[in-house]
């Protein structure tokens, strides 16, 4: 009778409401995924730009260190203008690495690295910037202080024999060679991440 009709009507209404809720949830999920995908693409493009600039600077640092090592190797017997010669050749200067990590910091602070479903890519990006930080700390704490001490030593001992300078030159050569190797490794990691990010944009 009427009760049965009302019951069927009520059940029908409930089913329609449930369907409506499910559709709304599906649309909401689709919108969230679309927004995440758009944000991820923006992050990816920004990271690619950062990595491209980083690579150029890393190459510049490699050339600088390679040139310095070559000059040190060619230095021969003491000459009167040896100190001035060192300054003219740029041996008393250093070139520190500078990278663009703004995009990475933003992604890290928002936990947005997880937007990349590729765990290997997440780890590679994190390792790259961690390695960069290590090199920067080494340069700031160790090399810069040693170079400053060397410059001070040279300034105060212009009439000194070159024997006292050989240790510093040896350190400079070793430090420059180490930096060269680190920069080379960073470039390799940079190129690997760049390839993965470009593949990500194709998806």
Label the model's feature ranges.
Residues 1-8, 29-203:
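Long, hydrophobic alpha-helical segments that serve as membrane-spanning/inserting helices
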Residues 11-26:
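Hydrophobic membrane-insertion alpha-helices, especially the h-region
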